[in-house]
């Protein structure tokens, strides 16, 4: 039998943790002074008067490097618990981690061959 009352603590935590940021944004929006002027509309650059246009276009290469970094950063997050529990879980976990690493290496080779890692 599936008992829903066992999840009451979870739902209470979910509701409270959702309401706190919503209330914080609402209260700051109500209590914050609203003053619009040329100083508020200008770009802030370390207290120095801005020179030129504040809009700057980034090259797509930065995005590709960031994406590859995030993929391998997440890989590290997944591999660390596997490495710490290897002696308890055994060979099956090693095989799963090996397959996971092979898939990521395949993705890295694909990105390399497509030229995503070339800096030109």
UniProtKB/Swiss-Prot annotation:
One term under GO cellular component: NADH dehydrogenase complex
Coiled-coil stretches noted in the UniProt entry, renumbered to this chain: none
Membrane spanning stretches: 10-30, 64-84, 88-108
UniProt-listed InterPro entries: NAD(P)H_OxRDtase_bac/plastid, NADH_UbQ/plastoQ_OxRdtase_su3, NDAH_ubi_oxred_su3_sf
Enzyme Commission (EC) number: 7.1.1.-
Family matches, as Pfam families: Oxidored_q4 (PF00507)
The reaction(s) this protein catalyses: a plastoquinone + NADH + (n+1) H(+)(in) = a plastoquinol + NAD(+) + n H(+)(out); a plastoquinone + NADPH + (n+1) H(+)(in) = a plastoquinol + NADP(+) + n H(+)(out)
One GO BP annotation of this record: photosynthesis, light reaction
Keyword terms: Chloroplast, Membrane, NAD, NADP, Plastid, Plastoquinone, Quinone, Thylakoid, Translocase, Transmembrane, Transmembrane helix, Transport
Its biological purpose: NDH shuttles electrons from NAD(P)H:plastoquinone, via FMN and iron-sulfur (Fe-S) centers, to quinones in the photosynthetic chain and possibly in a chloroplast respiratory chain. The immediate electron acceptor for the enzyme in this species is believed to be plastoquinone. Couples the redox reaction to proton translocation, and thus conserves the redox energy in a proton gradient.
Protein's name according to its UniProt entry: NAD(P)H-quinone oxidoreductase subunit 3, chloroplastic
Origin organism lineage: Eukaryota, Viridiplantae, Streptophyta, Embryophyta, Tracheophyta
């Amino acid at each position: 039998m599936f008992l829903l009352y066992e999840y009451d603590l979870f739902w209470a935590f979910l509701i409270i943790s959702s309401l706190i940021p919503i209330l914080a944004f609402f209260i700051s929006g109500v209590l914050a002074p609203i003053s619009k002027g040329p100083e508020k509309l200008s770009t802030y650059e370390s207290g120095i008067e801005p020179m030129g246009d504040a809009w700057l276009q980034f090259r797509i290469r930065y995005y590709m490097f960031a994406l590859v970094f995030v993929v391998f950063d997440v890989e590290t997050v997944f591999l660390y618990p596997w490495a710490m529990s290897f002696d308890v879980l055994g060979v099956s976990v090693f095989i799963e981690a090996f397959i996971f690493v092979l898939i990521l290496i395949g993705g890295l080779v694909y990105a390399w061959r497509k030229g995503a890692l070339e800096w030109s």
